[in-house]
Design a protein with these regions (language model features):
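Short loop-to-alpha-helix "cap/lid" segments that border enzyme active sites
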Residues: 1-135
Length: 135
């Protein structure tokens, strides 16, 4: 997963996407480009990029975030932990989008999210999570 930070404008997004295509040539089938910035997702879509895409969500958009992800051809959503409610995870699954949750440092919370069927977890304590979640 490659997270792309926000860019100033559409032209910057296009330049960045063209650069990514060159720099990540060998990873086009494996890499997922994620961003909070829809300008990045728009540029990926307009360039018919082979990279998988993911929308990162840090503000409470609810179901609208799922609609945005689908609109931009995303295969996943990365929810901020506080936004990853049971209901939003259920709706994201129903939309057939993979789910990652960030930043989860509490083991019990991570176990609960794992039981809900999320596909990815971003944490500041990876060793602890690997031991505790039996991964």
């Amino acid at each position: 997963e490659v997270e792309i930070k926000a860019v100033a404008d559409e032209a910057a997004a296009e330049r960045l996407i063209l650069s990514l295509h060159n720099e990540l040539k060998g990873f086009k089938k494996n890499a997922t480009i994620t961003s909070f910035d829809v300008k990045i997702l728009t540029a990926l879509q307009q360039h018919h990029s082979h990279f998988k895409r993911g929308l990162l969500v840090e503000i409470p958009l609810g179901e609208y975030a799922i609609e945005l992800a689908q609109q931009y051809g995303c295969c996943q959503i990365g929810w901020k932990d506080q936004l990853a409610t049971d209901e939003i995870i259920k709706l994201t699954h129903q939309a057939k989008l993979d789910i990652s949750v960030w930043t989860v440092n509490d083991v019990e919370r991570a176990k609960y999210l794992q039981q809900l069927g999320i596909q990815g977890l971003i944490t500041d304590v990876p060793s602890t999570m690997l031991r505790s979640l039996c991964l």
